[in-house]
Amino acid sequence: MGKQVDSKTITWVIENFSSLQSASIHSDQFVVGDCKWRLKAYPKGNEKATYLAYRANNLALYLNVANSKSFPIGWTRHTKFSLTLVNQKSEKLSKLTESQHWFDHKSTSRGFPAMIPLTNLHTNEGFLVNGELTLVAKVEVLEVVGKLDVSKKSSPVMETIDVNGFQVLPQIESVNRLFAKHLDIASKFRPKKPYMKTAYMNVLLSLTKTLCQSPQDLSNDDISGAGAALTYLREAGFKLDWLEKKHGEIKEKKKKEEASLKRLQEMEKQIFNEAQIYKEKVLAARAPLSLNEDNVF
């Protein structure tokens, strides 16, 4: 039996959460304590949960051993872990749950079948921002029995890297470019906890990606959502003058596009109607005259 303490904190951003159709989804794998792990979520509830009341209308979230079949007989992992459902508007409203468990071949999954009622998730402001749900997992392996030569390299989607005090997912180049072009972007940023910083940065990157698209590719809902995201980020202390200007330009272009499209459709309809009138006149002019005997003789 080997004693060791190995820990890792990962962030899982679930996009388009409200429109997910799958009964369950899982994160990419990550390595802690010579073991591959992943998070598994049930967006509409775990129908196999022990307690009937937990089976529906709750977000269920679990920590799973991803490579359990590869371990030797008798393997175990004594693990302490926490799962945080991030409220991106107020860290005080974030939901933290903790557990300690011996994982083995009979018990490869541990978690929380009622992390939060879905009604609370969808109605409370801050958990879902731009359709994204952010989860943070801290996994500490306290004791190891049975080792495998597993790669320490985790999926780049999961690892976080420090950039100007922000623990960011591997959009590191995008974040570096933001800070290089806008040095004071976060000079008045208030939240201090790492997972809150990560959540805000994810919103900022998503917003930047949205505003880089052509107005033609954006719906009015997209533009409205971008405006809400700007307000949300500005209230946290981000300085985003250039994005606000970009958002205003996109709104104006979208209005002009819609006005021009409406006028074009009106003109096409008018031309079509006029064409129908002239078509009828042409057909009438081509029609042969009918003659009877009284007209001829």
From Swiss-Prot:
Protein name: MATH domain and coiled-coil domain-containing protein At2g05420
Pfam families linked to this entry: MATH_2
Coiled coil: 239-281
Keywords: Coiled coil
InterPro entries referenced in this protein's UniProt entry, alphabetically: MATH-CC_domain_protein, MATH/TRAF_dom, TRAF-like
SUPFAM superfamilies in the cross-refs: TRAF domain-like
SMART domains: MATH
CDD domains associated with the record: MATH (cd00121)
Domain MATH span(s) in chain numbering: 7-139
